[in-house]
């Protein structure tokens, strides 16, 4: 959000301020940041929603001592079968989400931006005053992301990998990890496909409408947690393997909209007017003009949708039963039960999940690099 809007700012204004004697900090404080206030507010609301709807992290690291609205909903359903309490918590969480979106729309104007290949300019490089910020950022990323991943990979064993075809120590799992992986891959195809289809259609409609409030209903699933959505599906549709990818598609659709819609708006309307004058209809304009121009953006949206489906745990923990368990659900079951075999299988499953994420991300990056070089 912030990066996309920042990339579109007029650099000439900052250069003019520096020529007048303003330093880097003064330029950022009085010129750059006021122009980024809307995007910063939207990003802050998004971070808040991700924190307040966090489920898997609280469940794993909280160790029963730390709870959230999401974990209370989960335990009310799975341990006490208390649907009334779970419904009350779900209502509170939904109200928080609606209020957060209202604040974002009121203060931040819902501003968002996505960098497209045509907007990326070659930088003149970093100067000495900017290097400390870069170093601190790199250290932070290494500390909170890279080191834990490397620690997981270091504990991977071949024996644990070979055990993935089994059901764990004392028959813990209903299905093998490989079967759960197959379920996750199937869900990725369905969820990412539906999210991309719905997200593109909604983005296309929003780009042709001047009513910005129409975007809010489609973005609500971004703030409403997967546990609440899974609970809703559990009450209305009941069990069934298709409910999991449907919820995952619903969760991924707002991300697709947030990526595709700003990119569509940034294209302007000149090309559309020319195409209409030439006799093209809406479908032809999208297929022959807009889609080719947004190919990299659509690819990024597909990657995000696939990653959301792959790592989704909240709804799957409520809706995936028996032989329909997904990879994150099986991983949680292995981590939650003691035993050397379960532990080694959990480390192997973690490594496999990391490889999947890396492969999906790198495939998109390689395709985009080849297109740029050609």
Model-derived segments and spans:
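Membrane-embedded alpha-helices of multi-pass transport/permease systems
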Residues: 1-13, 52-56, 103, 146-150, ...
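Transmembrane alpha-helices
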Residues: 1-6, 10-11, 24-53, 135-143, ...
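Interhelical loop and adjacent transmembrane-helix boundary motif
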Residues: 58-98, 155-175, 310, 316-366
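Cytoplasmic-entry segments and transmembrane alpha-helices of multi-pass inner-membrane transporters
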Residues: 14, 38, 126-136, 201-233, ...
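Membrane-interfacial helix termini and adjacent extracytoplasmic/periplasmic loops
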Residues: 25, 58-65, 119-121, 166, ...
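C-terminal transmembrane helix and the adjacent membrane-cytosol boundary/short C-terminal tail
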Residues: 3-14, 18, 25-26, 57, ...
């Amino acid at each position: 959000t912030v990066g996309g809007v920042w990339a579109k700012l007029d650099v000439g204004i900052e250069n003019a301020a520096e020529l007048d004697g303003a330093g880097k900090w003064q330029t950022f404080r009085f010129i750059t940041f006021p122009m980024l206030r809307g995007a910063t507010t939207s990003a802050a609301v998004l971070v808040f929603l991700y924190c307040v709807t966090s489920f898997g992290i609280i469940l794993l690291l909280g160790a029963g001592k730390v709870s959230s609205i999401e974990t209370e909903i989960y335990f009310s359903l799975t341990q006490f079968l208390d649907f009334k309490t779970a419904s009350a918590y779900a209502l509170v969480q939904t109200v928080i989400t609606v209020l957060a979106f209202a604040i974002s729309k009121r203060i931040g104007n819902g501003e968002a931006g996505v960098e497209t290949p045509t907007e990326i300019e070659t930088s003149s490089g970093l100067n000495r005053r900017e290097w400390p910020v870069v170093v601190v950022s790199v250290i932070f990323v290494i500390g909170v992301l890279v080191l834990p991943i490397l620690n997981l990979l270091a504990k991977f064993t071949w024996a644990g990998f070979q055990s993935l075809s089994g059901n764990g120590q004392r028959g813990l799992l209903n299905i093998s990890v490989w079967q759960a992986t197959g379920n996750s891959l199937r869900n990725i195809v369905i969820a990412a496909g539906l999210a991309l289809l719905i997200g593109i259609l909604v983005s296309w409609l929003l780009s042709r409408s001047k009513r910005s409030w129409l975007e809010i209903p489609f973005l609500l699933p971004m703030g409403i947690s997967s546990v609440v959505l899974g609970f809703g599906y559990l009450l209305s549709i009941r069990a069934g393997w298709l409910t999991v990818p449907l919820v995952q598609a619903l969760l991924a659709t707002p991300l697709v909209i947030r990526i595709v819609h700003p990119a569509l708006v940034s294209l302007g309307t000149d090309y559309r007017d020319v195409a209409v004058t030439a006799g093209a209809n809406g479908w032809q304009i999208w297929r022959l003009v807009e889609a080719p121009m947004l190919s990299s953006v659509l690819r990024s949206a597909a990657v995000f949708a696939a990653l959301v489906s792959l790592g989704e745990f909240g709804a799957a923990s409520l809706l995936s039963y028996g032989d329909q368990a997904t990879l994150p659900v099986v991983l949680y079951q292995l981590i939650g039960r003691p035993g050397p075999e379960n532990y080694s299988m959990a480390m192997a499953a973690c490594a496999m999940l990391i490889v999947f994420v890396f492969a999906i991300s790198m495939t998109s990056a390689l395709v985009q690099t080849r297109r740029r070089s050609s």
